[in-house]
Each structure stands twice: as structure tokens, then as C-alpha cells.
Amino acid sequence: MEKIYSKGVVLGYRRSQATQYPNISLIKIEGVVSREDSTFYLGKKVCLVSKVSKSAKNPTGHKISWGKICKTHGSSGVVQARFARNLPPKAMGAPVRVMLYPSNI
């Protein structure tokens, strides 16, 4: 069976000394160790699945935040992903799914 996503971890927000950008996060993808490896993932979708309380509006109890990998960060295989909405601070260190589509092969 083909897998449709790779695992990753949110490292933190993109930031400088004075400013942090909560809608752009640094993500370390499992098995990616160089800048050349991480260029394969440019343009891929990222989803963060977080648990929320169940309600009539949300019967599953899961909230999914979608983002897109926009650029590499450094030389160790970390990438930057831009999310549609700001990620909550609780997402630091949380696992994410890096979808293997859209394909650019």
C-alpha cells in the first residue's frame, strides 16, 4: 500500500530577534537531512490535526489546520510552511502530516 503522507514535527514559528510570524512554522520532516532532500517537498500540503471538544458543529472532535510548504530553512532539511490561520502555541512539538501531493515529478 502506498503511503500518502510523511510525518513531521512543528519546531516553532519563523522568527527574528524582535518579531515572530505565527502563520509561518518551521517543520522537520522525518528522513529529510539536507537542503536537496527538502526541495522535493516544496509546494506540498501540510495538515495539523488537533483535538477539540465534540459538538453538533464538530462531531468528530478533531480540528485540521491546513498549510503549504513554501521554502527550505537552513541546510539540515527543515522547511517553512505557511498556514491559512495562525497556529496555536500548543502546536509546538506536535506531529504534522506532510501530504505527498500535489506531485511535481
Swiss-Prot record:
GO MF term (any one): structural constituent of ribosome
Parts forming coiled coils: none
GO cellular component, one term: extracellular matrix
Protein name, per record: Large ribosomal subunit protein eL33
Record function comment: The protein was found to bind to both initiator and elongator tRNAs and consequently was assigned to the P site or P and A site.
Keyword Transcription regulation: no
InterPro entries cross-referenced by the UniProt entry: Ribosomal_eL33, Ribosomal_eL33_sf, Transl_B-barrel_sf
UniProt-listed GO biological process terms: cytoplasmic translation; ribosomal large subunit biogenesis; translation
Family, per entry: Belongs to the eukaryotic ribosomal protein eL33 family.
Alphabetical list of PANTHER family matching this protein: 60S RIBOSOMAL PROTEIN L35A
One Pfam short name: Ribosomal_L35Ae
Keyword field: Ribonucleoprotein, Ribosomal protein, RNA-binding, tRNA-binding
